[in-house]
Amino acid sequence: MFIPSHQVWLVGLLAFSLVGAEYYDTKTADKDFLLKQKKVYNLLYRVAQPALANITWYNEGQAWNIEANIDSYTNAAAVKEFLSIYKHGMLPRGELFSLYYPQLLREMSALFKLFYHAKDFDIFFKTALWAKNNINEAQYIYSLYTAVITRPDTKFIQLPPLYEMCPYFFFNSEVLQKANHALIFGKLDTKTSGKYKEYIIPANYSGWYLNHDYNLENKLIYFIEDIGLNTYYFFLRQAFPFWLPSKEYDLPDYRGEEYLYSHKLLLNRYYLERLSNDLPHLEEFDWQKPFYPGYYPTMTYSNGLPFPQRPIWSNFPIYKYKYIREIMNKESRISAAIDSGYILNNDGKWHNIYSEKGLNILGNIIEGNADSYNTEFYGSIDTLARKILGYNLEAASKYQIVPSALEIFSTSMKDPAFYRIYKRIIDYYHSYKMHQKPYNKDEIIYPNLKIESFTVDKLITYFEQFDTTINNGLLLEEQRNDDKPFLIKIRQYRLNHKPFNFHITINADKPMKAAIRIFIGPKYDSHHKLIEIPEDLKYFYEIDNWMLDLNSGLNKITRNSLDCFFTMNDLEPSEIFYEKIETSLNSDKPFTYNERIFGFPGRLLLPRGKKEGMPFQLFLYVSPVSSEYNQYNSRIWGGYKFDKRSFGFPLDKPLYDFNYEGPNMLFKDILIYHKDEFDMNITY
């Protein structure tokens, strides 16, 4: 099935110094890890057809009695809660699921707790086998993903690519129609690759048939519908499930701050892609006026229901008015909290948010997560905005729902409304930062560090073909033993870039540990007007951040684009990854894995640019690191060391009357070239 490409965080040994960077550990799996890895993949194989997936395990699941084995779980109350819900009826198999419906969330949460509190992996596996047979497929997949990410005994166990598990969230309905009929009608061209027969289906993105003159947002369809980007967003929200209390499940205490900053990075990356397509800043919107961007998905759910659409410049439906009244009240309370500096907690006491943990508190109440100081008073403007802008009808009953794209994490970023929601939310972030005391020059200028030079290789982007195997997400007949195994693959073009290096020379007056940050931002706006500094620094996007040891004198550093701290390469297809597991189990061949399970798609590090070269600028910042630093640990992103400064430093609080000119900081003009496919064989 798949394995992430090895990313070594290494800065080269060059002329004047040895420069060491922090890196993600790579481990060699022992047999226990391999067996767990194999079983997890089998738990997520053909979830809609468990008896066809493995009849032995299907029978084992049916034989497992949770109530009779209540002592096999570490939390009897959680088991009783689940059994009570199950006996009163849960979401039937085949029905649609979304976290944004309280009853469905309650059921899924109870199932997750059942998985989480299994006393060992064997009990967890048996419980999951039972649930695979009896629980709604989407509830099962989501709760199992969350449990594997959270349980102590499944740390860094890889999960199947979500776009293989749930292709209906990633590909157009006409493509999946062909996939479902590929074997029945035999109309698709096939090819033989190794031991498999492959069916290749070319695919467009949604809206390929629309007139772009009237729907300019469609220029960005290759970006907002990228399967790697949408899978990244799913895992971003899995890092801190909004319904999960941090203390109860030992989650880090910066979830609110990470929620805000990670969405700020996504928004800035999106903005750079807008510039590459000559689109302006996002417009403001009013809850009492028509909403500009339309959304016309050509996707259907696995049960055949279409994703809801939203016409361009449409008035809000009457059945959304109750949510509009509520969100306007909640937004006014959050604005008042930022302006006053105080929020009201559950005990009716005022709490100062201009404190060390203040931004984290603010992020929690905006998201409305389980750590919010006062969910009743501040609600969740994140959830309410999705409810309103999704334009889906109200549920006919608690189990008859048609979620909008905004109510499914892996489809949220496809809707242009997503970016309007988070522009509004990130405006609160900027407002909070502007209310804080700005940095003084002594906090960001370090004369003992001087950047002598900063260059970067030629930056070239292009579109490439990518094949996705989707067998696991389709209903398929049992294959005859004499048939050659077949794979159904969807082929799409995706944005990528040629690898490149940053070349940095730093002069240090003494040996020290330092932190290097690299940001990319616009040079001009969509009207070709030079951006303003520091006002427009809020649009800069952090692409790298690492610590290293500097020697006294000149230090020459080379940093490759593959090393950027939060990126990773594409995942291997499931059939390849699974074969590696079995090979290692049946031989002496080692199986290695990274201590992380996902990252931002490295392909999308750079905006598309233009054929003639599009101007952007890099901002390089170097600062000393004290003996103390932050050890960032994530079950999804891995472990990494950062200095103790805030996310986005030093651009998070712009310093006015200062052009960010100093010995330890530097702006660098760059051009990003986009090459057509037929140009890629030409040497430049």
UniProtKB/Swiss-Prot annotation:
Gene3D superfamilies per the UniProt record, alphabetical: Di-copper center containing domain from catechol oxidase, Hemocyanin, C-terminal domain, Hemocyanin, N-terminal domain
Name of the protein in its database record: Hexamerin 70a
Residue ranges annotated for the Hemocyanin N-terminal domain, each copy included: 33-155
Annotated source species: Apis mellifera
GO function terms (MF aspect): nutrient reservoir activity
Localization (cell): Secreted; Nucleus; Cytoplasm; Cytoplasmic granule
Organism phylogeny: Eukaryota, Metazoa, Ecdysozoa, Arthropoda, Hexapoda
Domain Hemocyanin middle: from-to ranges: 161-429
Superkingdom per UniProt: Eukaryota
Keyword vocabulary terms for this entry: Chromosome, Cytoplasm, Glycoprotein, Nucleus, Secreted, Signal, Storage protein
Residues in Hemocyanin C-terminal domain copies: 438-674
